[in-house]
Amino acid sequence: MKKLVISLMLAMMSVVGYAQNVTGRWVTEGGDSQVEIYQSGDKLCGKIVWLKAGDGKLDSKNPDKSLQSRKLVGCDILTGLKKGKEKWEGGKIYNPKNGKTYKCAICLDGNNLKVRGYLGVFYETQTWTRK
């Protein structure tokens, strides 16, 4: 009986661990891009790996003029996300469409990723789907 209980607990822990795995490739809301989320030490980051507009699009809206000539494909847009109880939080998300960076939190919702950007008390949530 003790072995059965331990086996069930281990099985449940592996399912919970898998359910919280947000790493991998995600299609952004609207399907214009794909982001690869990856572990970097104890934090998560995410970089653009595909753009509908093609891989030659530049980061022209970046407020740092020295970065305006870099390609968006390969650019980190999610940085510094730390694991919390129910979500990854405390990170930043860069929006290449307007060149602004926002506070960010993400959480898994089935096969969807809820990506929330904050500006003060205001926020916007996007739903990304696993590729």
Show the residue positions of the predicted features:
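Positively charged n-region of N-terminal signal peptides that target proteins for export
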Residues: M1-L4
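Bacterial N-terminal signal peptides
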Residues: S7-S14
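Sec/Tat signal peptide C-region and signal peptidase I cleavage site
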Residues: V15-A19
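Central antiparallel beta-sheet cores of small beta-barrel/beta-sandwich binding domains
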Residues: V22-T23, E29-Y94, Y102
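Short loop/turn positions at the edges of beta-strands in beta-sheet-rich folds
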Residues: E29, K85, L108-D109, F122
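Short, exposed beta-strand-loop hairpins at the edges of beta-sheets
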Residues: N95-I106, N112-G120, E124
